[in-house]
Swiss-Prot record:
Disulfide bonds join 65-112, 164-176, 169-172. The lineage of its organism: Eukaryota, Viridiplantae, Streptophyta, Embryophyta, Tracheophyta. Belongs to the protease inhibitor I3 (leguminous Kunitz-type inhibitor) family. SMART domains: STI. This is Kunitz type trypsin inhibitor 106. The keyword Disulfide bond applies. It comes from the Eukaryota. The keyword 4Fe-4S does not apply. InterPro entries: Kunitz_inhibitor_STI-like_sf, Prot_inh_Kunz-lg. Its main location: secreted. It is found in: Secreted; Secreted, Extracellular space, Apoplast. CDD domains: beta-trefoil_STI_KPI104-like (cd23367). It comes from Medicago truncatula.
């Protein structure tokens, strides 16, 4: 009887361990080769569907500052790499997790002489959508404008980026939104309040 109980207990424990391991792996954001995205590495962000545009980059919308976050027009463009900085890193702080607030920063200098962090900008009067720009948010959105999060899609390895910094401020009520494209005057800008844009992360 004790032998049967022991075997049954071992089987249950094995299933529990498998569940925990699978859940833990699912918490990590994966790059295009299935490896966890790490905060100290550089990555290109690009759409899953290549005819939607190329890699992410900084775009001059109207020859003025700040620069906007956008996409290269085609997959042939070099684009700019980014680094991810989690708001609340875990003990394994180098790994980026889904549904957690983080900062996204282009690893490049800006002609505007300012931070190259992604930031939630003002609502565009023509499209009614909130644009993603670069710079440090000191007041516009309660200092929460620099925090985004990577969320899963039904397809493994494909993600959306959202602005919804509820980890930074759990008691705040935000008008959350998902990043999508906005085509304007031959340029591709990134903005909220459209359909979700599936993205992947390609290590440099």
């Amino acid at each position: 009887m004790s032998m049967r109980l022991s075997i049954r207990t071992l089987i249950i424990l094995a299933h529990v361990c498998l569940f925990i391991t699978t859940t833990t792996i699912a918490q990590f954001v994966l790059d295009t080769v299935g490896e966890p995205v790490e905060g100290d590495e550089e990555y290109f962000i690009r759409p899953v569907i290549t005819n939607k545009g190329g890699r992410s980059t900084m775009v001059s919308r109207n020859e003025s500052c700040p620069l906007h976050v956008g996409l290269e027009l085609t997959g042939l463009g070099r684009g700019l790499v980014v680094k991810f900085t989690p708001f609340a890193p875990h003990h394994d702080f180098d790994d980026v997790r889904v549904n957690r607030d983080l900062r996204i920063t282009f690893q490049a200098s800006s002609s505007c002489v300012q931070s190259t962090e992604w930031r939630l900008g003002e609502k565009d009067t023509k499209s009614g959508r909130r644009l993603i720009i670069t710079g440090t948010d000191s007041a516009t959105n309660g200092s929460y404008g620099n925090f985004f999060r990577i969320v899963e899609t039904p397809l493994e390895g494909m993600y959306n980026i959202q602005w919804c910094p509820t980890e930074v401020c759990p008691s705040c009520k935000f008008e959350c939104g998902t990043v999508d494209m906005l085509n304007e005057n031959g340029k591709i800008l990134l903005a909220l309040d459209g359909g979700p844009l599936p993205l992947v992360f390609q290590k440099e």
